[in-house]
């Protein structure tokens, strides 16, 4: 659910924030297509990654990349900052799903389909929770800008937490070297 929360808050509200930060800019309608371009690039790149190692490191990296995209947009609410943030947010989007599904196949080969449904539902819970959370932040802060900033900080924090959980899992439950990933 952390990836769903991090993605939906950013993808939904970053264009709104950009409109407030860059009023009248002719590039405002380009942020969604840039995110889509990042998704396409990420989808192509993720299929080129060898699936022989511990995918939890790749999942952590994807979470960190999305958190970085949010941080850049917060640190630099400028045209270059929003361009970078939009494009980079999209890059790990499909890779997260692809790597997570491969990890499910490794952990639960006999019941992978059920677990894939479960993680999809959990991702959806994060997506559902995001917009109401933003609404609460907007009501509880002094300005709309402060509410959006806090919401994006929470989204980035959720992604960093998700990455740290994956890294913690690699230490707590290392892959068994006698049964390495087979490259499925």
Language model features with spans:
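A late C-terminal transmembrane helix in Major Facilitator Superfamily
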Residues: 110-143
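Helix-to-loop junctions at the C-terminal end of transmembrane segments
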Residues: 42-55, 138
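Intracellular juxtamembrane helix-capping segments at the cytosolic ends
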Residues: 95-108
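Extracytoplasmic gate region of multi-pass secondary transporters
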Residues: 1-33
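Structural signature of the two symmetry-related core transmembrane helices
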Residues: 57-72
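A membrane-interface helix-boundary motif in multi-pass transporters
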Residues: 136-159
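Helical-face signature of the major facilitator-like transporter fold
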Residues: 4, 70, 78-90
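Multi-pass alpha-helical transporter architecture, strongest
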Residues: 153-184
């Amino acid at each position: 659910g952390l990836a769903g929360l991090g993605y939906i808050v950013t993808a939904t509200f970053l264009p709104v924030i950009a409109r407030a930060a860059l009023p009248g800019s002719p590039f405002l309608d380009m942020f969604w297509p840039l995110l889509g371009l990042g998704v396409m690039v990420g989808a192509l790149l993720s299929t080129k990654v060898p699936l022989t190692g511990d995918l939890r490191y790749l999942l952590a990296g994807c979470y960190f990349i999305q958190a970085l995209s949010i941080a850049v947009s917060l640190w630099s609410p400028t045209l270059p900052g929003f361009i970078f943030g939009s494009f980079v947010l999209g890059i790990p989007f499909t890779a997260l799903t692809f790597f997570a599904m491969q990890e499910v196949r490794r952990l639960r080969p006999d019941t992978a389909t059920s677990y894939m449904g479960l993680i999809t539902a959990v991702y959806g819970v994060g997506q559902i929770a995001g917009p109401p959370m933003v609404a609460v932040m907007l009501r509880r802060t002094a300005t709309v800008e402060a509410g959006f900033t806090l919401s994006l900080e929470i989204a980035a924090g959720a992604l960093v937490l998700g990455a740290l959980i994956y890294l913690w899992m690699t230490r707590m439950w290392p892959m068994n070297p006698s049964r390495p990933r087979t490259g499925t």
